[in-house]
């Protein structure tokens, strides 16, 4: 997803798309900034606010469960995962990062549904703050582009 705004794509028209967003509340200052940037970019790409479902869950490990519920509804063209995992002093960082990332990827493949993964995994708060705006925008662009790409392949 890095630098999704680089280059050009003709797949960034979001006018007819329905998007689901699942945001972790843990590290809420960062995840709120991710969500705000993501929602602004979705609007800029033409996604109607009434076609966006935005859910909040406790943390990154809960994101996949909510994504699965949205995927099972078959009401969405793409989904977006938002969260922030900051390394601490224990192995918990690796566990949460690996398990949440793996589950998001597995859901995308199992449901053949694009899921833009913007669950940040960073060493410290400064790294998260440096990425919150860009990665929120990137997630919106990835979701719209991949939804449109899969429609062209159907």
Swiss-Prot record:
EC number(s) in its UniProt entry? 2.5.1.78
Provide the top EC class.
Answer: transferase
Q: What does the entry list as the binding residues for (2S)-2-hydroxy-3-oxobutyl phosphate?
A: 89-90, 131
Asked if the record carries the keyword Cytoplasm, the reply is no
Residues annotated to bind 5-amino-6-(D-ribitylamino)uracil? 26, 60-62, 84-86, 117
Q: Which GO terms describe its molecular function?
A: 6,7-dimethyl-8-ribityllumazine synthase activity
Pathway(s) this gene product operates in, as recorded in its UniProt entry: Cofactor biosynthesis; riboflavin biosynthesis; riboflavin from 2-hydroxy-3-oxobutyl phosphate and 5-amino-6-(D-ribitylamino)uracil: step 1/2
For the keyword Nucleotide-binding, the answer is: no
User: Known CDD domains for this protein?
Assistant: Lumazine_synthase-I (cd09209)
Reaction catalysis annotation? (2S)-2-hydroxy-3-oxobutyl phosphate + 5-amino-6-(D-ribitylamino)uracil = 6,7-dimethyl-8-(1-D-ribityl)lumazine + phosphate + 2 H2O + H(+)
User: What domain of life does the native source organism fall in?
Assistant: Bacteria
In which family does this protein belong, per the annotation?
Belongs to the DMRL synthase family.
- PANTHER family, from UniProt? 6,7-DIMETHYL-8-RIBITYLLUMAZINE SYNTHASE, 6,7-DIMETHYL-8-RIBITYLLUMAZINE SYNTHASE DMRL SYNTHASE LUMAZINE SYNTHASE
Q: What does this protein do?
A: Catalyzes the formation of 6,7-dimethyl-8-ribityllumazine by condensation of 5-amino-6-(D-ribitylamino)uracil with 3,4-dihydroxy-2-butanone 4-phosphate. This is the penultimate step in the biosynthesis of riboflavin.
- The name under which this protein is listed is 6,7-dimethyl-8-ribityllumazine synthase
In the UniProt record, the gene name given for this protein reads ribH
């Amino acid at each position: 997803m890095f630098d999704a705004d680089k280059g050009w794509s003709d797949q960034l028209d979001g006018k007819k798309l329905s998007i689901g967003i699942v945001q972790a509340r843990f590290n809420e200052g960062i995840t709120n900034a991710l969500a705000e940037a993501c929602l602004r970019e979705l609007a800029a790409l033409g996604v109607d606010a009434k076609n966006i479902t935005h859910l909040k869950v406790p943390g990154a490990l809960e994101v996949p469960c909510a994504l699965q519920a949205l995927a099972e509804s078959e009401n969405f063209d793409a989904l977006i995962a938002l969260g922030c995992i900051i390394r601490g002093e224990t192995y918990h960082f690796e566990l949460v990062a690996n398990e949440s990332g793996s589950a998001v990827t597995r859901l995308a493949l199992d449901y053949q549904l694009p899921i833009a993964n913007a669950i940040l995994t960073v060493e410290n708060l400064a790294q998260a703050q440096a990425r919150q705006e860009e990665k929120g925008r990137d997630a919106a662009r990835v979701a719209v582009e991949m939804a449109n790409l899969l429609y062209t392949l159907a």
